[in-house]
Amino acid sequence: MARPEISEVTKLTDDDLKNKIDEIRKELFDLRFKRATRQLSETHRFKEARIQLAQLLTVQGDRNRSKTSS
């Protein structure tokens, strides 16, 4: 799965953003589990998932800050 551009992430609604964050966190959990049981073959997915999660959390944080300052 290709990493989405930040402009695509900012277009998501708040609910879609929360769902995507939950989805990426579950994926990271599954990747950690596979690594612990030595079943992981795609180790590059860790980096991609962490970067994508960071992007999503950044957008969510920006929205929360803009809502509280308004």
UniProtKB/Swiss-Prot annotation:
Designated name of the protein: Large ribosomal subunit protein uL29
Top-level taxon of origin: Bacteria
GO cellular component assignments: cytosolic large ribosomal subunit
Gene source species: Prochlorococcus marinus (strain MIT 9211)
InterPro entries the UniProt entry points to: Ribosomal_protein_uL29, Ribosomal_uL29, Ribosomal_uL29_sf
GO aspect biological process, one term: translation
Single GO term (MF): structural constituent of ribosome
Family to which this protein belongs: Belongs to the universal ribosomal protein uL29 family.
Keyword Ribonucleoprotein: yes
Keywords in alphabetical order: Ribonucleoprotein, Ribosomal protein
Matches recorded under Pfam families: Ribosomal_L29
Keyword Transferase: no
